[in-house]
Amino acid sequence: MHEIIYRGTRYRTHGELPTLGSYAPDVSLVNTRLQDVSLANFMGMRKVLNIFPSIDTPVCAKSVIVFNKLAEDHGDVAMLMVSYDLPFAHARFHQEHALENVEGLSAIRHAGFGENYGVQILEGPLAGMFARAVVVLDENNTVVYREQIADIDNEPNYVAAYKALGIDVDPLELEI
């Protein structure tokens, strides 16, 4: 069990993030074209899983925009934005913000992602949604970085996530 903070109160999540060096669980998610996808669809690519409660909250929205911007020069990295939002919400957001470098993925059709990745919030007003986390995988789906953001209102450490991929990022690039 892990705990996250939302508006000053601690809430439990189901399990823990996958451990460093472990093989990431492969689960099915739904893309904006309503197709089932899994990590196997991105085999041979390094992957950043940006996991969050909802695309329609300011911090979540900013994280997607920042990861999209960071991905502009790194087409060999699959940027997977994962939430329980409907695929239509991801599609709308991508269109509104002209996002071309990230893949919006919904867990709505397939149970298990939140449990397998230890991000499903178990209690409180966000129960059933995902806690904010980033998991970085190498080409073979081995976990090379993981971050469970303690306070759900905080952004992930973008620089550390990219550093795990061997990519240096200027913090000024993160300004949107």
Where are these regions (language model features)?
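Chalcogenol-based redox active-site neighborhoods
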Residues: M1-I176
